[in-house]
Amino acid sequence: MAHSAALPFVLSRSDDKIAGREITSTHETIHGLLRLDGDRVHVQWRVARSTDRVGREIRTDREVEPVREAVIPLSTIAGATVRWRWRWPPGPYLVLTAADLRAFEEVAGAAGLNLNHPAELALPLRRADRALGNEFAGELELALAERALAAAEGNPMLATPDTPHANNTNDA
């Protein structure tokens, strides 16, 4: 059975610098979407950056980067859960745990998302999206369990509807 689910997320990060007689404040808002599509998790995100400069002149520069996407195979994910974070900012977080340290390499980095640990992708959720986060984690866990069951039975993964033999119902 092919699983599908989608979950939006929003990240914020900022950086302030004082150099000589100039103050620079940069604020980035990252709007993203996690999408479970069969045996892959797609992570899409767009960075909107606002840079305020105060010095000889006062100005604000705004920039929106193009959408980036990373595809993570389910075979590199060990699990998913929604946790409550009590530290600032408190709220629900979706945590994807990697089965391979290379799982989140495409997502992390200077142009990507910041990871506190290379084996965990923790994404803050809006409080209104907590139930949606639990549903996404459940769908992902179900897809992982079905993969493990198929591997234990020695069966190939269930055919997806777009493969030619998936809908073959010949009784002859």
Regions found by a protein language model. Give the residues of each.
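Acidic, Ser/Thr- and proline-rich intrinsically disordered linker/docking segments
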Residues: 2-6, 29-31, 60-172
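Anionic N-terminal interaction surfaces
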Residues: 1-58, 63-66
